[in-house]
Each structure stands twice: as structure tokens, then as C-alpha cells.
């Protein structure tokens, strides 16, 4: 019974994953829309593959073809591939690579060399070119692996695809499939997007979408204007055995016929060399004029490739080893300074918008001066964004080789919001505005903090209400809240008679409160809820607290020198004392 339930669960899971992939594929291939980030897509597909491998009884064999069949758009004629054109299975770590290697090893012929042909995995779209006696006969997309869309007219507009192969000392085969990747150079991508922008047309979110949209065009003239590029990566079907070459030699062969190939390709003689190639690829990707999202590892021996064969979905002799912690590069256009509740000033880099992990990133926090110095960031620098956990990507490094016309990041001397003095906190390595409630940037957040659940706990007084009250200059300091009446709040957006009355009731209720709530609510830097309780417990009433000394504070268990300094400094400021006495003047009853 138990087992049966689990089976149903797994089956549902597999079906749901398939549905998701199908929906994404359909949007991606037919409408050129990426609904999810590449990483999300890859990891979902990986999860599905793993489940299907483990629970093969649920694997409906007609399925894999069925889902991709929908990926063919009706606007193109279909062309049948001479040999299947499967996509590659993706892996993400060295352990997966070892597994792949073990499987290959099991199938080794006696004294067969374990070489791998390693190539950069260009992020474009696959194309199948059929040459008959050296003349381009047809070009098609991958489609469902069995047949693709006829894009011959468009392929003829791609300069790097030869219409006629170059003669060498080997005669041309009667029929050969040459496979490769069509992509768009990043420099071209930027140029075209700039042009589209000037015409107020919709921009492409990434180079691959642009390449795909440009190749799969009814109008070949558009393909021509987009100046697509092409690299060959292998041979599919060929009618004569004498053209059966090992992968690395096959690349040399097609290159001698005038097919451009990517020049970083390496023949790796050990797994260690594959690993080195992978690491090298991560380093060079920033300098390439095209996007790569990993490397392709192919068993070099043709004989062994044939022996390994294919599963229902993937060839067993090749694998796509993807970059796991994806990096994206962009430029720092400037730096803004945000002021937080406690006055901390956070430098935020304004970035040249970049599509990353499924969203467009425009800003990235630089945290503090220390981090800026450590990374050596300057305005106009080209920087790399790196995925950090599941949250917002962070700037991980500067590409110093690309440094040009840089400017130093200069921190303001006075607060840009309230002109108060800016001080440096040595321990936290950050700058903060000393304005407190006087600072417009801090006021809203301080007041929100003051009414929050653990502080004065005024129910119904949310951010929206506070923002309006501040904008209308009805409140400025905490004590102003207790001077509110229904007449002053009934006109606010989202308020009615009933809700106004309720809010006033809540405000009145909160006037009888506890000491720790007030200490916490006035927002002393570095004083959280537990420290506030600790202090309230010790001082018993507000005037004892106001008149305390540093030594007295230090004598309290759990309060260190840093916190003591923060409190003492806060209490030294007359403005803060008047905020507290104003609260007492509006009859705040502190228990
Ligand atoms: Zn300020």
C-alpha cells in the first residue's frame, strides 16, 4: 500500500515535470519566448531525466518524440534528417562527468584510446546542412531530432555557411550532413538591439533568442540583415565509409572544405585534461564575442561512438558539461547611495541592464566601502555578476583587462537626503547619516519601525498610511502619531470612516505600552528586540535609561562595548532626547 502511494506520487511528479518542460519548449521554439532561466530549465530537465532513469516503468517511449514534435512551427516546410539529430544530455558537476566516463570505459574495445574531443558549447541553435557533391542542398533546424524546419533560404544569407564546399585532395561525398551552431556575435547583438531601441521596437532579451528569431524567418532578407554566424561541429550522415573520421579529424576535414570551426577545440587524452579544458573555458568566456554555456565532451573515436549508440533521447557518446555557477558580465554606469532605517548608507551600483537568471538586473548592492576596495570596483568598470545561493546575484569581480575611462566611487560627505553629517562606523565598516528622524530617507523607515508589531504594535498603520502621512506633512516624529484623529486620516487613500475609527482606536490602545517597546521603537542603532528587553528589565523606567552612563551600560550582562557606545551616542544627541520627551508629552503611558 505504502509503495503504491509512492509510485503514484512519483508518476505525478514525472508527469508534472514533463508538462512544464513541454510548455517551456513550446514557448521557446515556436514563439521564441524564454519563460524560465536557462539554469532553471536545465535543472528541471535534469531532475526529470534522473527520475525517468530511476523509474523507467513510467517512461512512455513515444513521449520524448511527442513533446518535441510540437516544437516545430507550421510556417516552415519540414525536412527529414538523414540521421537522427539528438540534443545532448546536460551535466553540471565533475561527479556527473565521472559517471559518464565510467559508462564509456565499460564499452571500450581492447586497446581503444580513451580520448575526448572537447568543444565550447555555443549558445545558439543547431542547424543541419546537407551538401550533395559539395553543393549546399538544404538546411534545417533540429526540430524533433527526426525532422526539422526548412531554413535553406535563410541559411544562404549566412556568410559563413559556404554554398559550395572548397576543394581539397579528397573528392566530395555524394551526400553528407554537416552539423553546426548558428549564433549571433555579442557585438552584433548589441548593435541590433541599439538599432531596435532607436526605432522603439521590442528588444531581444538575449543573443540566442535573436539568433533563433533571425534564422527562423519567413523573410530571408531579415536573416541577412541580422548577420548571423556559424561554426560547424560535426558530421551526421555520410554516404561513404571513407569519410568516417574520428571527431577531432572530422572537424579538420570539414574545415578544409571551408566550413568554419571554433578554434578552442581540444583533443583531451585524459579526464584531467577534460577538467582543465572546462576550467579554461570558464576563464575565456568573458573575452569571447559569443555566449557559451558550457563545454561539449565527445568520445573521439568514431568506432566507439557507434558502439555506444543512443538512448531514446540522447547520444551516449557525448555530453554537455554546463557551467554551474553562471556568471554574467556588465558595466557599472554609476553608484547611488541608499539610506536605511538606522542611517546606514549603502552604495548601490547602477548597472547596464543585463538578462541574468531569468530577470533583467539593473542594480546591485556594493554593501560598503570595504567591499568596493577589496574588489577594486570603479565607475565604468566591466564586472561579473555571479549567482549567490538562490538570491539576487552579486558582483564577484572586476575584469581589469577591460578597464577604460574609469572614475573613482566617491562617498558623499553629508547625507544627500538631509545634509546631516555622515560618520564612519569602524566596526561595521559602513557610513551612516546622523540625521535620524530629521532625515527624510530614514523617517519613513523609522516610523514604520516605531509602529511595528514588536515596537508600539499599532495595527492597521502600514507603510502605505505612513508614506501618505509623511508626504502630506501630517507626521514627522513618533509623537505626531498620537496627535492624529479621524479627520486627519479619513481622506487618505484606502481609508474610510470605519477603518479610520479603528485605526484611531488602535493608536489610543498603543498609548499604554511597555518600556522595552519604546526603547526598541525609537530605533537606536544596533539595539534589537532582545537588547531592548534586557535594558527595560534593568532600568525599569525611561528616565533611568535616558540618564545612564557608559559604565552602567557595560555592567549589564549581554551588553558589549559596541552596543553601549551606540546607546550612549544616541542619548547624547539632544534631538533624540526631545523625541522621547515629546512622546511623554502626548501622555504615552509606559508600564
Ligand atoms: Zn540623512
From Swiss-Prot:
Species of origin reads Wigglesworthia glossinidia brevipalpis
* Manganese found in the keyword field: yes
Q: What is a single Pfam family found in this protein's UniProt entry?
A: DNA_ligase_OB
From the UniProt record, list the reaction(s) this protein catalyses.
NAD(+) + (deoxyribonucleotide)n-3'-hydroxyl + 5'-phospho-(deoxyribonucleotide)m = (deoxyribonucleotide)n+m + AMP + beta-nicotinamide D-nucleotide
Instruction: Report the EC number(s), separated by commas if there are several.
Output: 6.5.1.2
One BP annotation, GO:
DNA replication
Q: Where is the active site?
A: 121
Keywords on record: DNA damage, DNA repair, DNA replication, Ligase, Magnesium, Manganese, Metal-binding, NAD, Zinc
Keyword NAD among UniProt keywords? yes
User: What does the organism's lineage look like at the top?
Assistant: Bacteria, Pseudomonadati, Pseudomonadota, Gammaproteobacteria, Enterobacterales
Gene Ontology MF terms: DNA ligase (NAD+) activity; metal ion binding
Name by which UniProt lists this protein? DNA ligase
Gene this chain is encoded by: ligA
- Residue positions binding NAD(+): 38-42, 87-88, 119, 142, 181, 298, 322
State where Zn(2+) binds.
415, 418, 433, 439
Gene3D superfamilies membership: 5' to 3' exonuclease, C-terminal subdomain, DNA ligase/mRNA capping enzyme, Helix hairpin bin, Nucleic acid-binding proteins
Q: Which cofactor does it need?
A: Mg(2+); Mn(2+)
Instruction: Give the main EC class.
Output: ligase
The protein's role, per its UniProt record: DNA ligase that catalyzes the formation of phosphodiester linkages between 5'-phosphoryl and 3'-hydroxyl groups in double-stranded DNA using NAD as a coenzyme and as the energy source for the reaction. It is essential for DNA replication and repair of damaged DNA.
Give the family this protein belongs to, as stated in its UniProt record: Belongs to the NAD-dependent DNA ligase family. LigA subfamily.
Amino acid at each position: 500500500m505504502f509503495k503504491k502511494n509512492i509510485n503514484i506520487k512519483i508518476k505525478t511528479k514525472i508527469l508534472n515535470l514533463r508538462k512544464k518542460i513541454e510548455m517551456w519548449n513550446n514557448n521557446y521554439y515556436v514563439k521564441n519566448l524564454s519563460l524560465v532561466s536557462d539554469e532553471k530549465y536545465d535543472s528541471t530537465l535534469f531532475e526529470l531525466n534522473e527520475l525517468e532513469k530511476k523509474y523507467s516503468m513510467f517512461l512512455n517511449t513515444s513521449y520524448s518524440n511527442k513533446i518535441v514534435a510540437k516544437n516545430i512551427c507550421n510556417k516552415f516546410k519540414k525536412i527529414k534528417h538523414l540521421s537522427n539529430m539528438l540534443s545532448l544530455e546536460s551535466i553540471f558537476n565533475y561527479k556527473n562527468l565521472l559517471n559518464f566516463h565510467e559508462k564509456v570505459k565499460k564499452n571500450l574495445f581492447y586497446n581503444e584510446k580513451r580520448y575526448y574531443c572537447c568543444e565550447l558549447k555555443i549558445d545558439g541553435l543547431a542547424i543541419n546542412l546537407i551538401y550533395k557533391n559539395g553543393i549546399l542542398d538544404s538546411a534545417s533546424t533540429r526540430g524533433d531530432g527526426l525532422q526539422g524546419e526548412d531554413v535553406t533560404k535563410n541559411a544562404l544569407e549566412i556568410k559563413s555557411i559556404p554554398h559550395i564546399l572548397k576543394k581539397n585532395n579528397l573528392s566530395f561525398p555524394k551526400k553528407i550532413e554537416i552539423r553546426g551552431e548558428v549564433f549571433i556575435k555579442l557585438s552584433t547583438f548589441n548593435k541590433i538591439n541599439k538599432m531596435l531601441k532607436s526605432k522603439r521596437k521590442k528588444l531581444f532579451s538575449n543573443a540566442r533568442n535573436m539568433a533563433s528569431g533571425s534564422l527562423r524567418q519567413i523573410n530571408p532578407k531579415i536573416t541577412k540583415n541580422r548577420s548571423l554566424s556559424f561554426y560547424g561541429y560535426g558530421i551526421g550522415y555520410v554516404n561513404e565509409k571513407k569519410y568516417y573520421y574520428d571527431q577531432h579529424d572530422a572537424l579538420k576535414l570539414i574545415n578544409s572544405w571551408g566550413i568554419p570551426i571554433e578554434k578552442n577545440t581540444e583533443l583531451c587524452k585524459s579526464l584531467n585534461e577534460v577538467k582543465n579544458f572546462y576550467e579554461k573555458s570558464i576563464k575565456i568566456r568573458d573575452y569571447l564575442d559569443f555566449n557559451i554555456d558550457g563545454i561539449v565532451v565527445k568520445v573521439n573515436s568514431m568506432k566507439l561512438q557507434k558502439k555506444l549508440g543512443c538512448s531514446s533521447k540522447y547520444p551516449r557518446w557525448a555530453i554537455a558539461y554546463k557551467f554551474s555557477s553562471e556568471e554574467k558580465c556588465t558595466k557599472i554606469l554609476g553608484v547611488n547611495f541608499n539610506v536605511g532605517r538606522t542611517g546606514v548608507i549603502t552604495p548601490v551600483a547602477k548597472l547596464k541592464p543585463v538578462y541574468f537568471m531569468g530577470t533583467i538586473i539593473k542594480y546591485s548592492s556594493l554593501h560598503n566601502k570595504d567591499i568596493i576596495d577589496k574588489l577594486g570596483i570603479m565607475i565604468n568598470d566591466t564586472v561579473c555578476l555571479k549567482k549567490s545561493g538562490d538570491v539576487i546575484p552579486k558582483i564577484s569581480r572586476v575584469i581589469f583587462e577591460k578597464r577604460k575611462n574609469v572614475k573613482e566611487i566617491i562617498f558623499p560627505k553629508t547625507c544627500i537626503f538631509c545634509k546631516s553629517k555622515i560618520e564612519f562606523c569602524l566596526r561595521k565598516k559602513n557610513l551612516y547619516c546622523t540625521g535620524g528622524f530629521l532625515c527624510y530617507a530614514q523617517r519613513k523607515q523609522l516610523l514604520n519601525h516605531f509602529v511595528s508589531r514588536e515596537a508600539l504594535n499599532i495595527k492597521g498603520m502600514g507603510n502605505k498610511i505612513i508614506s501618505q502621512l509623511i508626504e502630506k506633512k501630517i507626521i514627522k516624529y513618533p509623537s505626531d502619531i498620537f496627535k492624529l484623529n479621524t479627520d486627519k486620516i479619513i481622506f487618505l487613500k484606502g481609508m474610510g470612516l470605519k477603518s479610520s475609527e479603528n485605526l484611531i482606536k488602535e493608536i489610543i490602545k498603543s498609548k499604554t505600552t511597555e518600556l522595552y517597546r519604546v526603547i526598541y521603537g525609537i530605533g537606536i542603532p544596533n539595539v534589537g528586540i532582545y537588547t531592548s528587553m534586557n535594558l527595560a528589565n534593568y532600568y525599569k523606567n525611561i528616565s533611568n535609561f535616558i540618564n545612564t552612563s557608559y559604565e552602567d551600560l557595560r555592567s549589564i550582562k549581554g551588553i558589549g562595548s559596541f552596543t553601549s557606545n551606540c546607546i550612549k551616542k544616541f542619548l547624547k544627541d539632544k534631538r533624540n532626547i526631545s523625541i522621547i520627551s515629546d512622546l511623554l508629552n502626548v501622555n504615552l503611558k509606559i508600564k
